[in-house]
């Protein structure tokens, strides 16, 4: 599936021809898309001593829009059959026995890795959005970004420093409190980490 994303500043009437089944939303609603992959497998003994693992893999692209039900944009199903007779006879395929682990199912580790990857990625995006909201909120009141200011720019700096660490802030502190000796009481600025 191919997507061509265009900025809202460009002509809004263009729709990707490969996505003709998707109705264009030009009303400014907040929508997101996500891909859901489900795999269901079962092992069957098709004849005495012969085992086949049958899997059904479903991939769906879903669109979530505020105030609307979830919409299935695309859905694909894939069926596979694998001969697992050797694995079953050797005992390497687990059917939930305690000695091999209750969660030792084929493909489970991959699913767990995908869940972890998606969860941590979503969590980091959440924290980035929360930090952006915090910065926007405090900047609307004119509160300076003590920990985000670099030496010569107003953009956030990846280097975090204590408020008196930069020379510019040290000079401002000395002017405000009339001290030139460098002796500063930092007890009020200490924070738990």
Curated annotation (Swiss-Prot):
InterPro entries: Fra_a_1-associated. Residues 1-27 are annotated as: Disordered. It comes from the Eukaryota. Interacts with FRAA1E, FRAA2 and FRAA3. This is Fra a 1-associated protein. It comes from Fragaria ananassa (Strawberry). The lineage of its organism: Eukaryota, Viridiplantae, Streptophyta, Embryophyta, Tracheophyta.
């Amino acid at each position: 599936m191919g997507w061509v994303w265009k900025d809202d500043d460009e002509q809004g009437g263009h729709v990707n021809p490969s996505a003709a089944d998707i109705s264009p939303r030009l009303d400014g609603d907040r929508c997101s898309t996500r891909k859901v992959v489900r795999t269901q497998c079962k092992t069957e003994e098709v004849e005495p001593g012969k085992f086949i693992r049958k899997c059904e893999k479903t991939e769906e692209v879903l669109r979530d829009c505020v105030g609307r039900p979830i919409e299935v944009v695309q859905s694909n199903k894939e069926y596979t059959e694998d001969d697992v007779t050797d694995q079953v006879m050797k005992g390497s395929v687990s059917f939930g026995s305690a000695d091999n682990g209750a969660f030792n199912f084929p493909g489970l580790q991959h699913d767990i890795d995908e869940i972890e990857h998606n969860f941590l990625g979503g969590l980091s995006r959440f924290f980035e959005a929360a930090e952006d909201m915090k910065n926007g909120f405090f900047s609307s009141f004119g509160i300076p970004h003590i920990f985000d200011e670099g030496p010569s720019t107003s953009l956030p700096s990846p280097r975090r420093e204590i408020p008196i660490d930069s020379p510019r802030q040290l000079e401002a502190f000395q002017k405000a409190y009339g001290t030139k000796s460098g002796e500063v009481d930092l007890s009020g600025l200490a924070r738990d980490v």
